[in-house]
Structures are given as structure tokens and as C-alpha cells.
Amino acid sequence: MSEAPKKRWYVVQAFSGFEGRVATSLREHIKLHNMEDLFGEVMVPTEEVVEIRGGQRRKSERKFFPGYVLVQMVMNDASWHLVRSVPRVMGFIGGTSDRPAPISDKEVDAIMNRLQQVGDKPRPKTLFEPGEMVRVNDGPFADFNGVVEEVDYEKSRLKVSVSIFGRATPVELDFSQVEKA
């Protein structure tokens, strides 16, 4: 008895903004055509982010790879045609148009690790880096500009060097109190 071919991960390009619908449609097509044995997971890797809008903290999801859907599958003519027949699928990424290349196990591991890390705590929608200019929009230092010195994503706080009366003064601020300058 021969061993079943191994399912590999492929990257499918979808219309931007329709990744979720493409993933759902693909799952439905797989069931409809009884091809569950050729397919594994179909996913759109996302992370939960927090943004401040109008003084309110809002959670939303941000896609790691906008415009792409990851599909675990055995590549053959039937599975290739099934994926290509799904509405809003533009094609596969990597390899040639008729012989797509799977992504490496190393890349898959990196994506899976990133997904596991994300599950713990939502990240801010805006990421800050040391040396970056920011504008304080709340608190006693509102309307002052400053330079980010340290970023603490665990506590969602920044240490910003604000210029007060010509002197740089380090100030601890919450992510919600600053915006990129």
C-alpha cells in the first residue's frame, strides 16, 4: 500500500479585503467536491489589535498577510483547479502559475509561532520604535512633541523625551496618550 502524499502549505492570493470570504468559500468547495482528504487547514492569520478611537479602546483584527490565504493541501490537478475555481482567488504565490511551490517548513513554523504569541495579549494597532517622533495628545503634556526612548508593549507604555522649556524631560505615557508625529 502506497503512502498518501504529504499535505504542504501554499499561499493563495485573494482580492484584498475578501480573505475571510475566500477561506470560507474554499472550505465549502472542498466539502462540496468531497476533497477533504486532499486538504488540511485553510487560514487567514490574524492578530488582535487595540486602537483608541474617540477616547474609546477598540479591539479589531489585523491580518498578518493582507490579500493572502494559507492553504494546507496535496497539490495535484484536481486540488489546483478547485482552489483556482473559488471566486476572488487570483492564484498561487511562488513557483509557476501551473506548478505552485509550497512555502518552506521553516516559514510555516515562524507563522505558527507568531500566531501562538498573539493569542496572549492584544497588541496596539500603532507600533512605536525608539528614536521615533511622537505628539502627545492627552494629559498635562498635550500638544508637546517628543522622541520615543523606550517602548513597553507588556504595559502599553512609552518613555518619551519631551522638550519642556528647551530641556528634554523623560515622561512615561500610555500608548493612548500619543500619536505618530
Swiss-Prot record:
Keywords: Ribosome biogenesis, Transcription, Transcription antitermination, Transcription regulation, Transcription termination. CDD domains: KOW_NusG, NGN_Bact_1. Residues 130-161 form the KOW domain. Transmembrane segments: none annotated. GO terms for biological process: DNA-templated transcription termination; regulation of DNA-templated transcription elongation; ribosome biogenesis; transcription antitermination; transcription elongation-coupled chromatin remodeling. Disulfide bonds: none annotated. The keyword Hydrolase does not apply. It comes from the Bacteria. GO terms for cellular component: cytosol; transcription elongation factor complex. Belongs to the NusG family. The N-terminal domain interacts with RNAP and the C-terminal domain binds either to Rho or to RpsJ (NusE). These domains are separated by a flexible linker. PANTHER family: RHO-INTERACTING TRANSCRIPTION TERMINATION FACTOR NUSG, TRANSCRIPTION TERMINATION_ANTITERMINATION PROTEIN NUSG. Part of the processive rRNA transcription and antitermination complex (rrnTAC). The complex forms an RNA-chaperone ring around the RNA exit tunnel of RNA polymerase (RNAP). It supports rapid transcription and antitermination of rRNA operons, cotranscriptional rRNA folding, and annealing of distal rRNA regions to allow correct ribosome biogenesis. Participates in transcription elongation, termination and antitermination. In the absence of Rho, increases the rate of transcription elongation by the RNAP, probably by partially suppressing pausing. Monomer. Interacts with the transcription termination factor Rho and with RNAP. One NusG monomer forms a stable complex with a Rho hexamer. Binds directly, but weakly, to the core enzyme of RNAP. Also interacts with RpsJ (NusE). The rRNA transcription and antitermination complex (rrnTAC) consists of RNAP, NusA, NusB, NusE (rpsJ), NusG, SubB, ribosomal protein S4, DNA and precursor rRNA; S4 is more flexible than other subunits. This is Transcription termination/antitermination protein NusG. It comes from Escherichia coli (strain K12).
